[in-house]
Amino acid sequence: MHNSLAELIKPRTVEVVPHGSHSARVVIEPLERGFGHTLGNALRRVLLSAIPGAAVTDVVIDGVLHEYSTIEGVQEDVIDVLLNLKNLAIRLNGPHDVYLNVDKHGPGPVLAGDIEASHDVEVLNPELLIAHINGNGRLRMTLHVQKGRGYQPVANRAIEGDSAIGTLHLDASFSPIKKVSYVVESARVEQRTDLDRLVIELQTNGTVQPEEAVKHAANILNQHLAILVDLKGEDLPLFGEDGPQFDPLLLHPVDDLELTVRSANCLKAENIFYIGDLIQRSEADLLKTPNLGKKSLTEIKDVLATKGLSLGMRLENWPPEGLKKLNQ
């Protein structure tokens, strides 16, 4: 029997079953045979690499110049303290990175709940042990928390050259997803017994709920695949009759991003006038711009992310001929 595209089975139910702390099982069924692995693998990869989160990226500890030091009056050495800080589950509700302080006298433990957080910062695991203070010891440190995606080693992260002496840089795991796996089981609809049931098991650090993480991952996939729905449609306009194809958003001036005056002026000073110009610059390139620091860089990255763009992208045949006339 000939099967048309209209006869493909589509998922009818999505069941979210919470279990344990910040964990859930997501069941999607029914699916055509093979679609379980297709969707499961794609969702798993996106969940692990593309869900945004926050992490400690830099630490300054009073009396410490490098990570191989010890801290007077503190049981743990510096490396152990830094490793503990990597397990911090923190949510930033504002658009910018933040600096948080810890100032604790001994004796006793230093917990994540001892971090002095502002109203737009939430520590989701306040019971996390950071260090033990002996006797009359004291631990004072400043934590730099940034937003990001995936895992970023220090070597791959743009760092300002004027970092203060004693600043300790951490490899940052921004992903709020702690574990994710999937299995494909057999499903049945009426007389068909060759269908798939996709079961996704995931655990987050509490900064995002499992159901929201899956929705976000599905939305990311949808945005990337939507452009393929109609390759000849108006969603892929031509610049000129025979010219290269560009997303019209890239042809807009950077003023349309509504950046702060400081950030916008810094970009224009570097001859970055269009969004297409901007996305081709790397973080390291922008940090070399006079008067543009990490705060401005974070603002630019956040605004681009809301439009599905990022720094470091590459565009063939850019700029298109006649671009300057487009927005006059």
UniProtKB/Swiss-Prot annotation:
InterPro entries reported for this sequence: DNA-dir_RNA_pol_insert, DNA-dir_RNA_pol_RpoA/D/Rpb3, DNA-dir_RpoA, RBP11-like, RNAP_asu_C, RNApol_insert_sf
Annotated GO MF terms: DNA binding; DNA-directed RNA polymerase activity; protein dimerization activity
GO terms (BP aspect): DNA-templated transcription
UniProt keyword list: DNA-directed RNA polymerase, Nucleotidyltransferase, Transcription, Transferase
Keyword Transcription: yes
UniProt region (Alpha N-terminal domain (alpha-NTD)), positions on chain: 1-232
Region named Alpha C-terminal domain (alpha-CTD): 246-328
Top-level taxon in the UniProt lineage: Bacteria
Metal-binding is among the record's keywords: no
A single cellular component GO annotation: cytoplasm
Pfam annotation, one family: RNA_pol_L
EC number(s) per entry: 2.7.7.6
Reactions catalysed, as given in the entry: RNA(n) + a ribonucleoside 5'-triphosphate = RNA(n+1) + diphosphate
Domain notes for this protein: The N-terminal domain is essential for RNAP assembly and basal transcription, whereas the C-terminal domain is involved in interaction with transcriptional regulators and with upstream promoter elements.
Family assignment from sequence similarity: Belongs to the RNA polymerase alpha chain family.
Role of this protein: DNA-dependent RNA polymerase catalyzes the transcription of DNA into RNA using the four ribonucleoside triphosphates as substrates.
Quaternary context: Homodimer. The RNAP catalytic core consists of 2 alpha, 1 beta, 1 beta' and 1 omega subunit. When a sigma factor is associated with the core the holoenzyme is formed, which can initiate transcription.
Protein name as it appears in the record: DNA-directed RNA polymerase subunit alpha
Organism of derivation: Methylococcus capsulatus (strain ATCC 33009 / NCIMB 11132 / Bath)
